[in-house]
Each structure stands twice: as structure tokens, then as C-alpha cells.
């Protein structure tokens, strides 16, 4: 056991086939990836697991992880952030991530604890729907991407969103969280 995360051994990542650490949290992430492919019509190749993202806050810098990044037709269309517990407390850092992960505003942001989900409008932050079943199907998300422009994010906004993300994900992280790396 490392910190408070119970290590259950090794498991095979559903999307990549790689061997990864088996934890309760990872089991939720794997179930979500499987749901996206088997129920929502996504291809495994549409979904990037554990995408690393560098964020800065002044002279501080860290690498964080985006649990699932969905890319359709070379556009980052949706990010999914997992975290146990309350969903509402995870809205703001997920929205910040959606404004940093690409040079444009991501259309859909999903916050989930593995049992429930809030699907957020990337630009406004408003809740579009609730529940794991309400995560958009691949074709719906693709249609949305084709009909909405990819609005660029200004450098000033990116800097502010990185600071927010740093505060939530790095400053407030558990010391045993090995997905966060200060650089």
C-alpha cells in the first residue's frame, strides 16, 4: 500500500493493453473507458488515457494528468476528469483544464466519481446533463464539433486557468498522489 491508495496489484489497461497499477480509482477509470467504447460508440483510438499536462503558477511548475481525453478528427472534443467524492467541487479545476489542454476551448467537460457524472459546457461551465448515461455518444459529440467553432483561448486566460488548475490539483493534492509531479 502506498499512502492511502490501496494497491491491488496490476491490471491491463482497457484502451492501451499496457500493464498499469490496479487501484479502486483505476477500476472506475477503466469502467468508464469501457463504457465509452462499448456503449457510446467511441473507438479506442479516439481516447487518450492519462494525458500529461504541464501547468505553471508563477515560478512554480507541475505535471498533472487528464484522465481521459477524447480526440475526434484531430480536435480535442471532450475531457473527462475522475475524482472520488463530490462532483461540484471538481467542476472548476476540470473547466480550467479544458482551457489549458488545447489552444482552443474544449466543447464538453465531464466530471465523474465513477458512480455519477456531470457533463459541463466547456465555455460556460453550465451543467448540460447529469449521470454517466448522459455522456454524449461519439456521433453526437462529432456533430457538435462540426457545428461549433474552436474558440481560441487568450494567453492571459491560459495563464489564469493554469494558476487555478495548479491551486486545485497541485497545492491541494494528496502527498501520496503519484499522478502529480512538481517540476
Regions found by a protein language model. Give the residues of each.
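Short beta-alpha junction loops
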Residues: 112-116
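A short, conserved, highly charged catalytic patch centered on acidic carboxylates
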Residues: 1-108, 118-183
Amino acid at each position: 500500500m502506498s499512502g492511502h491508495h490501496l494497491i491491488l496489484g496490476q491490471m491491463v489497461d482497457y484502451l492501451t493493453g499496457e500493464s498499469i497499477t490496479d487501484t479502486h480509482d483505476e477500476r472506475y477509470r477503466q469502467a468508464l473507458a469501457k463504457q465509452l467504447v462499448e456503449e457510446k460508440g467511441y473507438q479506442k483510438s479516439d481516447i487518450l488515457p492519462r494525458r500529461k499536462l504541464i501547468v505553471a503558477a508563477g515560478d512554480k511548475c507541475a505535471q498533472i494528468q487528464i484522465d481521459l481525453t477524447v480526440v475526434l478528427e484531430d480536435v480535442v472534443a471532450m475531457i473527462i476528469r475522475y475524482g472520488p467524492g463530490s462532483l461540484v467541487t471538481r467542476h472548476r479545476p476540470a473547466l480550467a483544464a479544458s482551457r489549458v489542454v488545447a489552444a482552443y476551448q474544449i466543447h464538453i467537460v465531464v466530471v465523474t466519481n465513477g458512480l455519477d457524472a456531470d457533463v459541463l459546457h466547456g465555455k460556460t461551465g453550465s451543467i448540460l446533463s447529469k449521470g454517466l448515461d448522459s455522456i454524449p455518444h461519439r456521433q453526437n459529440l462529432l456533430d457538435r464539433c462540426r457545428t461549433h467553432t474552436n474558440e481560441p483561448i487568450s494567453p492571459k486566460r491560459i495563464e489564469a486557468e493554469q494558476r487555478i488548475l495548479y491551486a486545485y490539483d497541485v497545492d491541494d493534492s494528496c502527498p501520496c498522489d503519484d499522478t502529480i509531479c512538481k517540476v
